[in-house]
């Protein structure tokens, strides 16, 4: 029994002292953060009006110095992903192209709260969201070398 205790003590001692501590380099936390806005566009290759939605989304992104991020959620075509229809259902998408701006709820003409909105509203609500204060931030340090990326 004493030998087992000695073996356990030696094993735990080796494991404990052989670990190398990794020192994380975390810079100072900034006093303020840059507000970013996410626009998620419901679209499809089959949709005749969707190129206009893509054009409006691109204009909104370009007009806001990289503070608006656009994502196209395809439905009913070869670029669709499994969760697009789920998101459309949860956020009450009623047409194409339409989209969500930071997934905020806004009132429609009848006073109903909707998250998915017409492409004509994206710019207005993106500017409104950009005017709000960002209470937290996210920093990602990345490096790309050839075909490898480190995050």
State what each model feature region is.
Residues 19-29, 124-151:
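Non-globular targeting/processing and membrane-anchoring segments
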Residues 93-135:
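Non-catalytic, surface beta->alpha helical segment in thiol-disulfide oxidoreductase systems
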Residues 38-41, 69-74, 97-102:
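Structural recognition of the beta-strand scaffold that forms the well-ordered cores
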Residues 28-68:
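Local sequence-structure signature of Cys/Sec-based thiol-disulfide redox active-site neighborhoods
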């Amino acid at each position: 029994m004493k030998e087992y205790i000695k073996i356990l003590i030696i094993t735990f001692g080796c494991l404990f002292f052989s670990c190398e501590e990794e020192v994380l380099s975390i810079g100072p936390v900034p006093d303020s953060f840059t507000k970013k806005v996410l626009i998620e566009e419901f679209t499809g290759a089959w949709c005749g009006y969707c190129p206009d939605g893509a054009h409006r989304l691109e204009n909104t992104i370009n007009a806001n110095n990289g503070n608006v991020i656009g994502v196209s959620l395809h439905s009913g075509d070869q670029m669709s992903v499994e969760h697009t229809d789920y998101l459309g259902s949860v956020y009450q998408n009623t047409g194409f192209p339409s989209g969500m701006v930071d997934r905020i709820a806004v009132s429609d003409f009848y006073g109903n709260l909707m998250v998915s909105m017409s492409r004509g509203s994206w710019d207005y609500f993106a500017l409104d969201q950009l005017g709000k204060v960002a209470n937290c931030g996210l920093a990602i340090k990345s490096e790309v070398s050839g075909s490898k990326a480190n995050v």
